[in-house]
Regions:
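Metal/cofactor-centered catalytic core regions of large enzymes
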Residues: 1-166
Length: 166
């Protein structure tokens, strides 16, 4: 059997190198909270400002180990608060007679299907792409939060989030 050995002298990386508009991005709670704060999302601004006031810290403190940890908690609070709103909407739907919970469908194994998911999970941006042929998965691709944050330095010297924060 032919075995190919990794050429450690050449250029290689142990993780994908995604870019958005040619630039590396940071994803996750810190990025999510900072973007929402900058966009003046009222729910986020209220919780961030209260945290900073209670801790006696300036806004710049979110760009620290403490800030990263706080952003995880802040995001959890914002998500929980939004969950209460979703629960209230669900109860209102049920009371009005809307009890449908899913749309049933049948997969035709003679067809080809393509799908994708692009969304947000606790660690950050997540995307999946899938292609199914004759009931068999032919291709599955994922770009997970660590892929964005651990991306290596590129040819232009732009570092990923992990490298740049170290």
């Amino acid at each position: 059997a032919h075995t190919k050995v990794l050429d450690t002298q050449g250029k290689y990386t142990w993780i994908k190198a995604p870019r958005y508009d040619g630039k590396p991005l940071q994803v996750g709670p810190l990025a999510n909270i900072v973007v929402n704060y900058a966009k003046k999302n009222e729910r986020v601004v209220k919780v961030v400002d209260q945290f900073l006031k209670d801790a006696g810290l300036p806004l710049e403190a979110v760009f620290s180990t403490l800030g990263r940890t706080a952003c995880r908690m802040i995001e959890a609070k914002v998500v929980a608060d939004n969950g209460l709103i979703a629960l209230e909407n669900l109860i209102a739907n049920i009371k009005s007679g809307d009890t449908q919970t899913c749309a049933k469908y049948v997969i035709d194994n003679s067809k080809e299907y393509k799908g994708r998911y692009i969304g947000h999970v606790p660690r950050g941006a997540l995307s999946h792409w899938c292609r199914i042929e004759k009931g068999v998965i032919k291709n599955w691709q994922a770009v997970v939060p660590s892929t964005w944050n651990a991306t290596p330095k590129d040819k232009d010297g732009a570092m990923g989030a992990y490298e740049s924060c170290l």
